[in-house]
A protein has these predicted regions:
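Compositionally biased, charged N-terminal/linker segments
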Residues: 1-37, 130, 135-143
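Pocket-edge structural micro-motifs
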Residues: 7-8, 45, 88-90
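Surface-exposed, flexible loop/turn segments at secondary-structure boundaries
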Residues: 12, 49, 71
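Short acidic (Asp/Glu) patches
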Residues: 26-29, 45, 69-72
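Short, conserved, surface-exposed binding loops centered on an aromatic residue
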Residues: 32-35, 51-57
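Short, charged beta-turn/beta-strand-edge "cap" motif at the junction between a beta-strand
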Residues: 45-51
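Aromatic- and Lys/Arg-enriched surface recognition patch
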Residues: 55-121, 125
């Protein structure tokens, strides 16, 4: 089992939460092929609305990747983004600013957001535990 942070706007993350999937990098398949069933995924939302610059900068969802491979979904306008099924846990959003000095991938870094630009970032167990605790996630972490 691995842990990763996936990047998606909060409005896109909300659709995934409601329908039980994750999609990243505006629907690209490559990042989703790097995660496996059983992996824990946290969604980091730099913005509330895709295409805006509202500066949300929050973790907005937390869950476990389910069995199966990435697949293409259907959206309006003929857009067919790649998705992966996730069982989402009850969790509250938390701003990354509250955690930045405690997470190994952001602590002490002036350009802390750079590793997140690729849409998916593997993180250590300790980092995911910090994120889950801050989100008040009651799911059995590591189970």
């Amino acid at each position: 089992m691995a842990n990763c942070v996936a990047v998606a706007s909060a409005d896109h993350a909300a659709v995934g939460l409601a329908q039980g999937f994750v999609q990243v990098s505006h629907g690209k398949s490559a990042p989703l092929r790097r995660i496996r069933p059983g992996d824990v995924v946290a969604i980091y939302s730099p913005v509330q609305v895709y295409g805006s610059r509202d500066g949300l900068q929050s973790f907005t969802a937390l869950g476990r990747v389910q069995p199966g491979e990435p697949y293409q979904g259907r959206m309006d306008g003929g857009f067919s983004p790649f998705r992966r099924d996730v069982a989402w846990w009850p969790a509250r959003p938390v701003r990354i600013g509250l955690l930045r000095e405690r997470l190994s991938f952001t602590a002490g870094k002036t350009n802390w957001g750079a590793p997140l630009r690729f849409g998916l970032l593997r993180v250590e167990d300790a980092d995911m535990a910090i994120i889950a605790a801050a989100m008040d996630c009651a799911a059995p972490f590591g189970a």
